[in-house]
Amino acid sequence: MTDLIVIGGGLAGSEAAYQAAQRGLKVRLFEMRPSAQTGAHQTHDLAELVCSNSLGSNLPDRASGLLKNETRLLGSMLLECAEQASLPAGGALAVDRELFARLVTERIENHPTIEVVREEIKEIPDSPTIIASGPLTSPALSTSIAALSEEEHLFFFDAISPIVHADSINMEIAFRASRYGVHKGPSTTDFATSAQSSAQDEGDYINCPFTKEEYYTFVAALLQAQRIELRAFEDAIKSGVKAGHFFEGCLPVEIIAERGVDSLAFGPMRPVGLRDPRTGKRPYAVVQLRQDNLAGSLFNLVGFQTNLKFPEQKRVLRLIPGLENAEFLRYGQMHRNTFIASPKLLRPTLQHIHRDDLFFAGQITGVEGYMGNIATGLLAGINAAHLYHHEEPITLPQTTMLGALCHYVTHADLKDFQPMKANFGILPSLDFTSKIGKRERGAAYAERALADLESMILECRSLLLHNPTASLSDSREMT
């Protein structure tokens, strides 16, 4: 007998299944891959990271860092796996995407009360269910969701950055450095070699510096390059910038370049905090590459999502100084991301307004970012377990980052509803008696959030899987 069905083996679905199973439920986790493919995934593993390999900032006074500390406090399994697969990335948490997905898959498949079913769900079950099918929900299930909600789906377009082989990067031009000298340093894992550790001491990123002339030559080529022909259902992308069909954090570089010739230099190619060791000066612009696997043999172009045709990507991206002979493991590509009209359909508990036993989690709710997906999956799994045990589902305080995200996606103005990632702007404001800096404000919001979450945990011990006192202590140490 199954107590809960989870649809989707991505970040949210994997975390949701684990949280519910840890609380005594027998869970069937449905993942349609490999029998049905999405066009964006490369493997059959659960929790595959399709876009970047970064889970955002680790710093406790940043919004993403706070969300990590909240999910850590609540016992996130995926965050634990991410930290086991971590790579040097300055103040961010970047992972070896293959190792991360493998660790999650092993934890899920080896769990005694989780059954992984490799088949597509085409209709919403009438039993307790969490839908975490992600932005690439299959057409059949998407139709079923639309019929239940009597609401047309919303969407935006997302894009993937290219990945290059490290040994094809010209290190006579490119240089290792982290912005302002802030870097994580060598990985503590056994997979890292001493040679890689030595290189990481110089910085966690490889930087490709541009002169002003090189930058303008690159932008001109980028704007003239041919793009992948759009499929019929993606035709709205032609008016993407004006129509708002792109999530701002995932804009293709060619779309950013259309906004103005220097848009990239003030965006993903900004050179702040870096100096070219060949000149001793700050470059006019820079492309950063972040380590993509533990072996240090692959690097992705940070913030360089694109929808250029593959031969054009090879031609244009080889205009980047240091990448003139780059060999590409993966080219960039674009896909349509679907999400539901959550303000009209969901409660802050992530339950459907018309069905107590139907939950939604992850990017399909309009929460953006890997950590947001993990966190909403965690909450949906906890609340499904609460419902099973005849307990009230949890509504987290709006002063917490996860609580604020859930409140935002369920209370935003539907007319202007767009995906939202963790940021301090969605938290209730604090009254500061004097003017303080951004870092100090972030620290104050984080301190309040963790204090309020800890108070709620002490009142509701079922939120935690392990010893609450130990968990609270561990989280405080991270801050």
Task: Set out the residue ranges of the language-model regions.
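Beta1/beta-strand and adjacent pyrophosphate-binding region of the FAD-binding site
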Residues: 1-12
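N-terminal FAD cofactor-binding segment of flavoenzymes
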Residues: 18-80, 398-409
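A conserved beta-strand/loop capping segment in the N-terminal third of enzymes
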Residues: 42, 58-105, 109-113
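Predominantly flavin-linked oxidoreductase catalytic cores and closely associated redox partners
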Residues: 107-315
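A glycine-rich dinucleotide-binding beta-alpha-beta segment and adjacent secondary-structure elements
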Residues: 301-367, 374-376, 394-411, 417-427
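Internal hydrophobic alpha-helix adjacent to the cofactor/substrate pocket in enzyme cavities
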Residues: 374-394
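C-terminal auxiliary extensions adjacent to catalytic cores
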Residues: 420-465
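Intrinsic-disorder-associated, low-complexity terminal segments enriched in Asp/Asn/His/Tyr and depleted
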Residues: 466-467, 474
